[in-house]
Amino acid sequence: MKQKADNLIAQNKKASHDYFIKETLEAGIALTGTEIKSIRARRINLRDGYVQIINGSAFLENVHISEYKEGNRYNHDPLRSRRLLLHKREIARLAGIQAQQGMAIIPLKVYLKHGFAKVLIGVGQGKKQYDKRQTIKKRDQDREIHRKYGI
């Protein structure tokens, strides 16, 4: 029986528009019970999220996971900081990148892998407004060539 590829839950489409993605890295997320249930129900928003390194630990900040519908008084806070599960050397490398000017560490995708929630984080450099215009112009030219010549 063929298994689905990575069970994509959420994708940050705005990230590729706002950043040049230099490299990617897979990390686990430390979640509570109601959070994983909400993620499985696809009630997560990555748009404004980022990764912050604090005291040798990586945290996923400003990612909204909606409260679980059937949750009771023990439901989670939707915008709480969530610890990322990474090796020390990966955290040290990300801390060096975070210290550089103009570099950001952002979540790109959340997916399930063997039943566990994983986040694909990307190291990105912010785009300027003219870079965004050039990207749109190039995409339109490629579409026109494809439409005209069927390449």
From Swiss-Prot:
GO cellular component terms listed in the entry, alphabetical order: cytosol
Give the protein's biological function.
Required for rescue of stalled ribosomes mediated by trans-translation. Binds to transfer-messenger RNA (tmRNA), required for stable association of tmRNA with ribosomes. tmRNA and SmpB together mimic tRNA shape, replacing the anticodon stem-loop with SmpB. tmRNA is encoded by the ssrA gene; the 2 termini fold to resemble tRNA(Ala) and it encodes a 'tag peptide', a short internal open reading frame. During trans-translation Ala-aminoacylated tmRNA acts like a tRNA, entering the A-site of stalled ribosomes, displacing the stalled mRNA.
The protein's GO terms of the molecular function aspect are: RNA binding
Q: Which family does it belong to?
A: Belongs to the SmpB family.
Q: What is its main location?
A: cytoplasm
State any GO BP term from the record.
trans-translation
Put simply, this protein is called SsrA-binding protein
Please name the source species: Lactobacillus johnsonii (strain CNCM I-12250 / La1 / NCC 533)
| Gene responsible for this protein | smpB
Per the record, the coiled-coil ranges are none
Localization recorded for this chain is: Cytoplasm
* Keywords from the UniProt entry: Cytoplasm, RNA-binding
Extract the InterPro entries matched here. Answer: SmpB, SsrA-bd_prot, SsrA-bd_prot_CS
Record bears the keyword Aminoacyl-tRNA synthetase: no
Q: Is Cytoplasm included in the keywords of this UniProt record?
A: yes
UniProt-annotated stretches for the region Disordered: 132-151
Q: List, alphabetically, the PROSITE patterns matched.
A: SSRP (PS01317)
